[in-house]
């Protein structure tokens, strides 16, 4: 999980595993500090796993919620493509593609106007992705995925933490279950995560994206725009 991926397809299973681990640690902390109830499980329902009995028993001393929630969010991460869909909903993907990829490519081609949605889609799917895939110097691609992977890990954790803390806040206000911890600390954690995500994006993801775009030959960019009548 700590070894960075070399492609998007390599990144996905690693991201799901990272989501499982970060979620488990997060929910474990929530139980320890009184934000979530300790929901026990009868020992007879614990399957015998050789060499891991003590470890499993230790995990379950904190209740079933941390491990169950980790499994749940890891599945959601994979089935719903959580990082990608949330990023689209809140506009991160559009901003990323538009300002860091499409606009620089259009500038090289001498196009200063804003591209239409169809033109933008064509530039991404027919020019950017194919050309990046064919880059001979994979160093730039690997550096890109190195930074993007960690950004998505923290981004998914931020999304999961936000949803969880929202539920906890509602639960405390409506007395659905006992919450002894301070809600202020939880929302400060969300603010810290958002700030950290922004820092990673600006300091690492942005320059790596721009660097990768620059590896596409100017001649191919201009040829693509001319052939597709994007002026």
Give, region by region, the residue ranges found by the protein language model.
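Terminal transmembrane helical module of multi-pass membrane proteins
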Residues: 164, 168-174, 182, 192, ...
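Intrinsic-disorder/low-complexity regions
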Residues: 136, 184, 196, 217, ...
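Cytosolic juxtamembrane helix at the C-terminal end of the final transmembrane segment
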Residues: 82, 170-173, 201-228
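Charged, low-complexity, helix-prone segments enriched in Lys/Glu/Asp/Gln
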Residues: 141-163, 185-190, 194-215
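Charge-rich cytosolic interhelical loops and cytosolic tails of multi-pass membrane proteins
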Residues: 79-146
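N-terminal first transmembrane alpha-helix
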Residues: 1-108, 177-196, 203-212
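Loop-to-transmembrane boundary segments
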Residues: 7-22, 119-171
